[in-house]
Amino acid sequence: MFIDTVKDPAFWEKVRSDETYRPMIDTLLAEWEKCETAEIAEIPYTVAADFFHSGDRVKGERYFFMRRTALSVSAVLALIYPEERKYFDRMQDFIFATCNEYSWELPAHIPNMIDYIPDDIDLFAAETGFTLAEIYAVFGDRLDPLVKTRIKMEVERRIINPFADYNRKFAWIGYRSNWAAVCGGSVAACFIYLAPERFAEVKPRIDEAINNYLSSFQESGYCLEGIVYWDYGFSFFSSYAQLVSDFTNGEVDYFKMEKVKTIATFARSRRDE
């Protein structure tokens, strides 16, 4: 199982010693140089709201993506080098900062600021929930108790409870695009990691989203969104497919579907060209 592998110290010892992983580690350490000194201050309102006044996405999203990158980089380095406290401490700082954000949704995805609901779920709210839930599952009691509490509380408030409310409508469930896979797979991961006993109640919604996503592909395995969004959507689909297979002891196995095999083969054929 994936979660058992990443919780096993022997796996990370292999990562440290196997030269195959060296390029990945070098990339992470290069990113760390920026993450180590990155500002954790609260995103100013004028920056977050700038999109609604100027249409400029860059200012607000720069803060957003810097935090997500720093969180992920710090988390992986904390697993590779558990004896280096600086990575772990930085990760917890960014976890807390992320939990303190007013919204996990990008401003460009918010219909308007007047009627906005902070627990709406877009691509990046779902991804953020997935990241925090997986950190919770992987690090477990290594996390400070308050950090664990904040993760669980915020993911429940922003992702799990809203999605479990069938009176709430999420348009992306019906999208035949990467949105259905990224949002659906990420939301499902939040349930599996933090509220496994509730996964069955939302599985019909997840199934609908994933089926709509798979229906967006041509017979060749190509999607009309292009190769970049093919990669984006299928990476999240694959993560969910592995997670739900582990969770159901193989009862749900998307990787056995011929269509999924065709989609995966399409990418390989493109890379061989």
Mark where each language-model region is.
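Low-complexity, Ser/Thr/Pro/Gly-enriched N-terminal "stalk/linker" regions
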Residues: 2, 6-7, 13-52
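Helix-terminus loop motifs that line ligand-binding clefts
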Residues: 40, 85-120, 217-229
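Internal amphipathic alpha-helical repeat/solenoid segments
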Residues: 45-63, 107-118, 168-175
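Non-membrane alpha-helical segments in proteins
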Residues: 65-80, 93-97, 126-137
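Alpha-helical scaffold elements that line and support the substrate/ligand-binding pocket
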Residues: 71-74, 78, 187-189, 230-246
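Alpha-solenoid helical repeat scaffolds
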Residues: 80, 101, 138-142, 193, ...
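Active-site lining segments of carbohydrate-active enzymes
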Residues: 113-228, 236-239
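Carbohydrate-active enzyme catalytic cores, enriched for enzymes
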Residues: 239-273
